[in-house]
C-alpha cells in the first residue's frame, strides 16, 4: 500500500480505495483469486465479513486463521474507527497468489486510534491475535482512512 492512504478521500457507500500493491516479496506469483466487498459498519456485518472471506478462501489450509484475523480487524473497524459514524462502512479484501500466499485487508474510515489496552482491560487483544497468526501484518493510513492487512504464507 502506498503512503497515499493518509491523504485519501473518505469511504462512502460502495466506494473504496483501490490498493496500490505489488508482490509482497520478490519473486511472488501473481494473484489467482481476489475479491472485495463493502460492509456497513455494524457489529452484525462482522459475521458477514467472516463468511465472505471463508467463501473466498474455501479449501485453503490457512482459511480459518485468516477468517479469525479478519474478524478481529473488522471488529476494530466497527468499534474503534470513524466508520462507526452514521452511514459508515468498511471494506474487506482477500487475495491468494499462485504460490499460495494469502493476503487480507480491512479498510475503514480512519480516525483516532489507541491500540494499547490497559493491563486489566477485558478487550483490546485482537491485534495480538493477528500478530500471532499472521506471517506478516501491519496498519497504514491515519485519520482519512486506514488499512489493516495481514499475510499468511502457505504451510
Sequence positions of predicted segments:
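Histidine-centered phosphotransfer motif of kinases
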Residues: 65-83
Amino acid at each position: 500500500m502506498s503512503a497515499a492512504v493518509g491523504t485519501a478521500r473518505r469511504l462512502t457507500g460502495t466506494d473504496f480505495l483501490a490498493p496500490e500493491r505489488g508482490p509482497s516479496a520478490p519473486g511472488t506469483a501473481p494473484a489467482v483469486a481476489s475479491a472485495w466487498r463493502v460492509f456497513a459498519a455494524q457489529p452484525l456485518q462482522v459475521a458477514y465479513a467472516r463468511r465472505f472471506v471463508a467463501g473466498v478462501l474455501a479449501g485453503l489450509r490457512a482459511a480459518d486463521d485468516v477468517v479469525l484475523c479478519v474478524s478481529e480487524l473488522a471488529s476494530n473497524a466497527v468499534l474503534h474507527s470513524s466508520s462507526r459514524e452514521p452511514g459508515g462502512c468498511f471494506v474487506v479484501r482477500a487475495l491468494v497468489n499462485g504460490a499460495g500466499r494469502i493476503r487480507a485487508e480491512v479498510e475503514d474510515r480512519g480516525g483516532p486510534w489507541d491500540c494499547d489496552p490497559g493491563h486489566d482491560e477485558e478487550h483490546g487483544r485482537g491485534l495480538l491475535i493477528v500478530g500471532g497468526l499472521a506471517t506478516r501484518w501491519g496498519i497504514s493510513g491515519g485519520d482519512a482512512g486506514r488499512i489493516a492487512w495481514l499475510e499468511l504464507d502457505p504451510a
